[in-house]
Structure formats: structure tokens, C-alpha cells
Amino acid sequence: LFHRLVNLYNQTEGKIVFTCNSKILANDIKMRLPKFLDQMKVSRREDIDERIKVMRSWGSRLKPESGLYSYICNYYGLDFINYTMSGVEGFDGVCLSAISQLEDKKNNSDLPYCFDYVLIDEAQDFSDSFFKLCEMVTSNQVIVASDIFQKIYERKSNLVEKPDFTLNKVYRTDPKNFMFSQFLGFGLKEKPVIQWFDRDEDWQFSGYSFENRDTEEGLIYEFSREPINRFNDINSYEIIPTKIYYKPDTFNIVKQVIEIIDELREEHSDISPSDIGIVFVSKSNEGYKLADNISTIIEQKYNWETQKVYEEKYKSRENSKVFISNQNNVKGLEFSFLIGIVLDEITQDLESRNTIYMLMTRSFLTSYLILGDSNKDIYDKYKPMLEEILSTGKASILKPGKEDILQEEQIKDLIGSSLTLDQKIEKALKNKNRFSSDNIDKLKIMIKTLKKNKVMS
């Protein structure tokens, strides 16, 4: 998308907007764009602030240029709907409302365009209503880029499922790391399997080669991905792209993180704090306590600053610090080395599965996956698969029977059961169109009172 943006800037006089769902990704893109323009030797930039805008998708009514939707509402005088008032339909409903208002205006008068080109990154996060809204306000072209596998169990958009062009090679991370991370996300070593493509061409479409062989157990698929020489100055054979650990308690998890950093500092003399990202997957306070502990040790032992991005209002990545985050702030970011820590049991947790796939594919060189006490079974199932991938470049997977693949209704049930209390409260209130901060607080107090009365009785 950056290459396309530069071409549009150089070859046209049009107004261009680059958008995505995540605030931290939008801020990261703003910081990376000037460096990319330098690399592409773009010298004429006097009108760049007028012609190129980078913003997240939603935004704020008080800051119209903070988001594409808020910009559109301000430009055309539409009713702005914030998150609290969005109801059960969320951003999809917000976009549908804006579309309806624009259609009314279009019927009464000519509707001017506010952009010539819109570039949408991480498009798998959006439904088709957002794409239609962008088309209505764009004179020339809406360009959509997505990773269809960042949602391993559902798709929001028909447009994203039917792309004009497909890039089935992965350049950011090693193909072996990608295959391991995706197969862990798909649950291919478990029963039931979360995702399986019935048509062989769908595996090929996704960049996989495979051979089949019959065994007593059933039909075995031997998957592989084409190796890619991503770095001219690094011998890729010296790099282990994926490492997995099982640690039964937080003490040993912290110890393992420090051992990894020690090893990286020893092997890479020019390593900087910003080369390392640490992400924990936990729906409880245990993850934040662990992150505080890791942050303190890093700052004391290495004299490196850390950035716990979830504590910051503006969520902009700082290049001089070790990045530490929960699962909510890693989309679109890239690191030389990524350390993922999984505290929650993920066997039945599809959201966490999705997060693990996403965070594990953030690394240029190596991703480290540390599994906590509740995931010993996952470690035992996937450690042998990783060893096979690293040694042979292949993964042998038994084709599951139809009864061993999760069906749509089962997936919906699992998604619902994996929600936190706060998420369940939010969903319930949105379903009743009663979502507000006051109602959230009231419902929490009510639940707390009911639990207390139950204990007393």
C-alpha cells in the first residue's frame, strides 16, 4: 500500500487518505511514511500535508481529522455516532447510517467528493458498509488490502473474500513461522479442528503446496510453503524463526523472557530496545502484573526504557523503547523479535487463537511463544509439529472427518463463552440498545450484589 500511495502522489494531483481500524497502527503509519518517502527518493513534498492524510477509521466528533468516518461526517454535515451510542451493530451500523444520510443528500443535490483515492489497510477488520461509504465519497478508486487469515473463524466482508489480486507469499515473517502460527490458529493438531479447507485449491490459493499419502489413521496432508530469501545480508539458515516454551508459573515465564533477551543481546550486538516486542494474552489482571514485573526487570537490568502501550492515551509506538502490550495493540506492527506470552487456556478460546496467530506473524526474524500452565496440552501437541517444520519445512496433518471440524453454530457458541464479564455486559446492553457508561456501572453493581447475596445464602 505504501508503494501504491507513493505512485498516486507522484503520478496524480489527487487527495489521498490512508486508513485502518487501529489507532496505534494509524499512528505507526504516520511515523513510518516519511522514512518510506525518503527511501523512495520523493523530493517534492510541499503539498504532502494537503494531499495525504493518515487516520484511523472511526475518529472523534471533536477532532474531525482523527478518523475517516469523523472526517466524512464533518465534511458533509452528517450526524456523528460515537462508540457508546453505536448500539448492537457497532461500526457497521454507524457506516450504514452515514450511507443513508449521504443518499438523502445525493437525491436533493449533487454530492461532491472529499477524496480522490482511499487506501484501506487491514481490511479484514471491516464490513462491506465501510467500503461502500468510502466509495461514495471517493472520486477515483478505493484500494483495499487485507490478510484474510487474521480472522481464522469468521469473515465480515464479501468484498474481502473476493479480491482482485491475491498475494499468497508472506514476506514479513519466515514461511515456517507463518505455517506454524496458522496451523496452531486453525487447531489442526486437535479435535475438533477449528478451520479446514475442504477444497485442495483453497490450500494452494493460500500459498501451500502439499502431497497426500494414505495411512492406517487416514489421509495425511504433507504441507509446505515456498522458501523466500527475504534478506540479502543475512544467512537465513542461521535463524530459527519460531521457538516455543512451556512454563508452569509466572516466575519461570519472567525468567524465560529475560533469558531470551540475554540471548538476543549476546547474538546481536547492534540490537536496540525497539527491535523487541512483548505481547501477553490474558483476560485477567495477571497479565498486567506480569507485564509490570517484566518491565521493571528490563529497565533495571539493561537500562532500557519500556513502553506499556495500553497505559497510554494516544497509543503511538516509541522507537527507543521495548514495546509491551496486551493483545489489543499489535495489529499491523512489526518487530525483529516478538515474544508472545499466553496465560489463558486457549483450547476453546477462538479470540485468543486469532490473537496468537496475529502476534506470532509480527516478527521479521524470530517469534517466541511462551505457554503458561493452562496450555500444557497445546504445547505437547504442537511442539512436535514445530520441530518437523523447522527440520524439514513440512507439516504432516491428518485430514479431519467432517464430524471433527467445528461447525458455524459451535463456533458462535465458543466465541460467546470466551467473552469476559465486561464483554458480555457490553454485548447484552447493545442487544437491548441500552449501551452507556451509566448502564454498564449499574449492571456491574447489580451482578456484584447478586453474587454477594448468593454467597451469603
Predicted regions and their residues:
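The feature marks helicase ATPase cores and/or their adjacent C-terminal helical subdomains
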Residues: L1-S457
